[in-house]
């Protein structure tokens, strides 16, 4: 991976896109307030940390792509736990994008 493999910091802008085939009865894709709250929960513990020191990431190359998948998995779990509300049960997919800069970003997306 070259010089990026050495210890370095990154500040990301994180976007989460929620997908469903039809709007819910309230005209929503997802309750944005709950989605924002759950995104904060998904990111908790990652800020200002050496990610290679976290037990859950032992042996992993903590790339931007890997982190996008971690956030995706956490948001998907929130949907299945009901933390995004009953309306979120109609969601069919999520895309998580981590922007390192205006020219470098990575996304992970999948079905829920």
Task: Report residues per predicted region.
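Charge-rich, low-complexity N-terminal segments
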Residues: 1-112
